[in-house]
């Protein structure tokens, strides 16, 4: 097998249809450029058999034999005549159908007729009968058109379906035996027609024999092309995009098996729309006495995948994925069955070539004839009644007559072209289904209708229904009696000589029976109608129970159901009329006791019922495993969920190299698992947390009840963090068995930050992108807007670590980027390396969110904004101010997180920067805080000593002050401040300095 993609882009980048002629010499292509190209087929076949060196030279020499430009728009279908190698037809999206003869160089417009230029819909699919006589195509106006090439007649086949609402037929195909025509529509139904030629007049006759709707549950509505294909012997027809439940299938329907599905090919999603049978029948056995026959099918579609199947195998022969860059819309085998041509919307033509007998051994001519004879014997006679009722109940014929479309009722195209539209030829698009059905009725049906007209010869006037005496047991409900008169009943056959009573719309009918007068009810709407609009049609009546049928008068009477009397008790009591009392009455009203309907009602938790936020919870997995990060990787915790009850509980097992260490069973679903330094934590679907020890699986705490399912369960060291679906945050110290912190405002304070009231309502809220905890028990949250936060236990609030504002103007942004791409994003949280940085991790998350929102890139985006801002008055020091603010926030966050190394680096950078900018007040304040109390005898010093700590982030403040003085000594503007603090701390000797 070899695959060749023709490098040239054909038809302006879109090929919509291909076909190969009878003698296997030419191939047609059509597409977007309104042209039809005729190619030499053997030139393409030779390209797949030659070597690489010669192929490059020969590809440049492949040119079309003819370029036909008869159409004025996109040509979406071309088909060769099965009996003439020089004749083909083509259709476009304007609805025009041309017949071409390349030997005579003629191009005839066969539809629409010569005088009809507008009002036609696009041609969807087109097919030739095997004898080359009939041409059928489906159009966008939900019609199927039949054209006889011998007698030049035109007719519509749509009337046989008897549907109230027609749908577009995406695919249409004749069978190879000249007996059947099949179509597939957007309504997931498959219509099968049978046809024959009358022996005397040679007129065709069509009838609908089957309507299959159980194969396809749903169909892709955005697909323009679908291709049904018949097997070479006509025994099978393949249906693409068939589906069973949620599985996409390619169904094979058998003619001899009553058009039932006998085989399904599973290999595509809902993207397989094109199916094409190989024209040869293959035999897997070399012995013709006991043949094992099979067919080869090629399937493709909008998933850009080509699959070739053997119908006797469950798995395909091969799968070619991404053979094109855009959907595949047509497939075509050559007559030898050794080459497959693929057309796609990327403008490339692909050729798949097979070696002889690579797909199998072809059957002999004798066996081929036997198959055709056996197939002819299984075809049912044309006049036989279908096995199933294919006519909808609303359209059933009362005489059980088979609807037949006869050619004698068709339109002669030559006569229609000669006449003008005003001479009685109707516009085809304006023909209603009723008129079409009237024109195409069979002779037998017309005779029966004529017989009915003679029997039921009534004057077209309204005969009112006679109201009989109601039985004594019948209810006197006026609504019930009025409703009963609107029900449709059968009419009774009257004596034709009896004169019916005339009724005018303005007067009600009064009848007398048994001495009593009866007035027939009238609709209020009928009183206001004009008498000119009350034209009454003639109705056929039949024997009934003595009541007459209501005659339609241009409007359909609406039927109503009686109103329901099932009213709630509360509404009934509120609508009861109370007894009126005088204003001066001193009588005390009796208090009605409220009935007790429920005892011991459950009191709902307001925080759960009326939560400010709702977070998504993970789906319950059938089973999952986690490797231990604290111990060796050979330790694995395995979770297998049961049914969530006592009958089949969930199982938790801890293994070491497939050896069980401990096990536990829980009658609930397990959602999340987290590992600490000495414990495992497991959360259930109902909001419980179970804790186990690493070593033996001993319970460390009774189950922790949170009341709502968990969205996040994280741990680090001895700390365990849980975030519920309503945003509640908890952190526990499992070693001390105490709560470490709890957020009273939950996560709603973070998620509500981006909610802004606008004129058209609230804006979309941000979502959580990371939820973690540090080894000090500090929760970290990042949002989709790029902001990162930590929870300060002492303040009881969230504080900002990183946001996109500092990425906008800070010089020090990305100064802590992780250059090692092999490390995970959360590497800085769960490792003890000195290179890790929590602040750097959160700033990296901010970068990712910015890049997702701006396609141009962060640098280009912010550089443009910064230049525009710096040009404005008062914003000259914008970048310096943002940079210092960013450094100050970094220093404070590192102090809270305990990041010693980052704190030292940021602090030195900060003091150097304020010295360069000449901010003496900030430098003095920083040095004064590092110096601390210096006068031991003062009262202020004694009060400050209680709150002053000699260390900050593990560094002595005096040592840090000395480093600051030495680092900034080169700045001349700040030397007076540095000398002042240098004398106090002893860096500068006072005597030597003086």
From Swiss-Prot:
PROSITE patterns: WD_REPEATS_1, WD_REPEATS_2, WD_REPEATS_REGION
One GO MF term attached to the UniProt entry: nucleosome binding
Record carries keyword Signal: no
Biased composition (Basic and acidic residues): 414-426, 495-509
Cited SMART domains: WD40
GO biological process: chromatin remodeling; DNA-templated transcription; regulation of DNA-templated transcription
Alphabetical UniProt keywords: Chromatin regulator, Nucleus, Repeat, Repressor, Transcription, Transcription regulation, WD repeat
Annotated WD repeat ranges: 10-49, 70-110, 118-157, 164-203, 220-263, 276-319, 323-364
Annotated GO CC locations: chromatin; HIR complex; nucleus
Coiled-coil intervals, chain numbering: none
Keyword set includes Repressor: yes
Matching Gene3D superfamilies: YVTN repeat-like/Quinoprotein amine dehydrogenase
Subcellular location: Nucleus
Ranges of compositional bias, category Low complexity: 525-545
Annotated region described as Disordered, given as residue ranges: 413-445, 482-550
Polar residues bias: start-end ranges: 482-492
Similarity remark: Belongs to the WD repeat HIR1 family.
Function, as annotated: Required for replication-independent chromatin assembly and for the periodic repression of histone gene transcription during the cell cycle.
Protein name as annotated: Protein HIR2
Organism name: Debaryomyces hansenii (strain ATCC 36239 / CBS 767 / BCRC 21394 / JCM 1990 / NBRC 0083 / IGC 2968)
């Amino acid at each position: 097998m070899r695959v060749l993609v023709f490098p040239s882009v054909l038809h302006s980048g879109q090929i919509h249809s291909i076909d190969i002629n009878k003698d296997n010499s030419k191939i047609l292509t059509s597409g977007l450029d309104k042209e039809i190209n005729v190619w030499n087929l053997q030139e393409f076949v030779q390209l797949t058999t030659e070597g690489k060196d010669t192929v490059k030279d020969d590809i440049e020499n492949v040119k079309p034999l003819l370029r036909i430009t008869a159409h004025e728009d996109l040509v979406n279908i071309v088909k060769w005549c099965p009996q003439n190698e020089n004749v083909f037809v083509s259709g476009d999206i304007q609805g025009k159908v041309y017949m071409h003869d390349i030997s005579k160089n003629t191009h005839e417009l066969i539809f629409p007729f010569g005088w009809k230029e507008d009002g036609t819909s696009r041609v969807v699919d087109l097919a030739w009968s095997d004898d080359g006589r009939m041409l059928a195509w489906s159009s966008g106006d939900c019609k199927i058109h039949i054209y006889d090439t011998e007698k030049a007649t035109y007719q519509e086949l749509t009337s046989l379906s008897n549907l109230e609402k027609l749908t577009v037929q995406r695919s249409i195909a004749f069978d190879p035996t000249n007996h059947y025509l099949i179509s597939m529509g957007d309504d997931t139904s498959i219509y099968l027609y049978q046809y024959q030629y009358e022996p005397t007049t040679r007129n065709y006759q069509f009838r609908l024999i089957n309507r299959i709707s159980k194969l396809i549950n749903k169909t892709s509505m955005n697909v323009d092309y679908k291709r049904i294909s018949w097997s070479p012997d006509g025994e099978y027809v393949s249906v693409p995009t068939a589906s069973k439940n949620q599985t996409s299938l390619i169904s094979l329907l058998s003619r001899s098996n009553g058009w039932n599905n006998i085989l399904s090919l599973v290999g595509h999603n809902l993207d397989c729309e094109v199916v094409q049978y190989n024209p040869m029948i293959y035999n897997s056995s070399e012995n013709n006495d006991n043949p094992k026959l099979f067919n080869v099918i090629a399937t493709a579609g909008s998933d850009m995948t080509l699959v070739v199947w053997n119908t006797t195998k469950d798995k395909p022969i091969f799968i070619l994925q991404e053979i094109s860059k855009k959907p595949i819309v047509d497939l075509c085998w050559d007559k030898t069955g050794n080459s497959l041509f693929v057309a796609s919307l990327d403008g490339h033509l692909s050729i798949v070539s097979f070696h002889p007998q690579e797909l199998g051994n072809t059957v002999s001519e004798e066996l081929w004839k036997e198959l055709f004879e056996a197939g002819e014997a299984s075809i049912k006679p044309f006049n036989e009644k279908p096995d199933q009722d294919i006519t909808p109940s609303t359209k059933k014929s009362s005489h059980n007559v088979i609807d037949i479309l006869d050619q004698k009722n068709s339109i002669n195209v030559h006569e229609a072209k000669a006449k003008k539209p005003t001479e009685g030829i109707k516009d085809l698009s304006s023909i209603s289904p009723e008129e079409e059905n009237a024109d195409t009725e069979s002779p037998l049906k017309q005779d029966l209708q004529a017989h009915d007209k003679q029997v039921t010869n009534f004057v077209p006037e309204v005969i009112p229904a006679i109201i009989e005496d109601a039985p004594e047991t019948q209810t006197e409900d006026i609504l019930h009696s009025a409703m009963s008169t609107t029900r449709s009943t059968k009419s009774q056959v009257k004596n034709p000589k009896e004169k019916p009573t005339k009724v005018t719309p303005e007067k009600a009918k009064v009848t007398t029976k048994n001495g009593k007068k009866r007035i027939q009810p009238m609709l209020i709407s009928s009183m206001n109608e004009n008498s000119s609009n009350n034209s009454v049609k003639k109705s056929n009546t039949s024997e009934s129970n003595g009541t007459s049928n209501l005659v339609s008068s241009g409007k359909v009477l609406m039927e109503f159901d009686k109103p329901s009397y099932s009213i709630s008790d509360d509404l009934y009591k509120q609508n009861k009329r109370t007894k009126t009392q005088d204003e001066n009455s001193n009588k005390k009203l009796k208090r009605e006791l409220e009935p007790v309907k429920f005892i011991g009602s459950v009191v709902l938790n307001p925080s759960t019922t009326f939560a400010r936020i709702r977070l998504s919870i993970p789906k319950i997995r059938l089973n999952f495993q986690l490797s231990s990060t604290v111990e060796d990787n050979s330790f694995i915790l395995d979770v297998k969920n049961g049914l969530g009850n006592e009958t089949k509980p969930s199982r938790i097992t801890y293994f070491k190299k497939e050896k069980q260490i401990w096990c536990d069973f829980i009658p609930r679903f397990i959602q999340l698992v987290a590992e600490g330094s000495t414990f495992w934590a497991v959360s259930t679907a109902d909001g419980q947390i179970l804790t186990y020890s690493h070593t033996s699986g001993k319970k460390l705490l009774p189950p922790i009840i949170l009341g709502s399912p968990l969205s996040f369960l994280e741990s680090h060291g001895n700390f365990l963090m849980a975030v519920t679906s309503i945003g509640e945050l908890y952190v526990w110290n499992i070693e001390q068995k105490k709560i470490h912190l709890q957020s009273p405002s939950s996560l709603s304070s973070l998620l509500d930050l981006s909610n802004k009231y606008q004129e058209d309502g609230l804006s979309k809220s941000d979502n959580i992108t990371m939820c973690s905890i540090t080894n000090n028990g500090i929760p970290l949250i990042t949002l989709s807007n790029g902001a990162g936060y930590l929870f300060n236990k002492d303040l009881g609030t969230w504080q900002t670590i990183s946001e996109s504002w500092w990425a906008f103007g800070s010089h020090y942004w990305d100064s802590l980027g992780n250059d090692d791409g092999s490390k995970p994003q959360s590497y800085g949280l769960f490792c003890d390396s000195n290179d890790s940085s929590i602040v750097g991790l959160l700033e990296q998350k901010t970068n990712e969110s910015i890049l997702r929102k701006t396609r141009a890139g962060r640098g280009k985006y912010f550089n443009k904004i910064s230049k525009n801002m710096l040009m404005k008055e008062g914003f000259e020091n914008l970048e310096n101010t943002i940079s210092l603010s960013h450094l100050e926030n970094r220093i404070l966050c590192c102090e809270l997180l305990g990041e010693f190394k980052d704190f030292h680096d940021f602090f030195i950078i900060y003091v150097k920067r304020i010295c360069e900018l000449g901010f003496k007040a900030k430098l003095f304040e920083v040095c004064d805080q590092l110096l601390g109390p210096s006068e031991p005898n003062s009262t202020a010093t004694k009060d400050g000593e209680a709150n002053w700590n000699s260390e900050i982030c593990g560094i002595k403040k005096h040592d840090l002050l000395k480093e600051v003085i030495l680092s900034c000594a080169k700045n001349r503007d700040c030397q007076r401040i540095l000398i002042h603090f240098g004398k106090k701390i002893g860096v500068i000797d006072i005597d030597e300095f003086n």
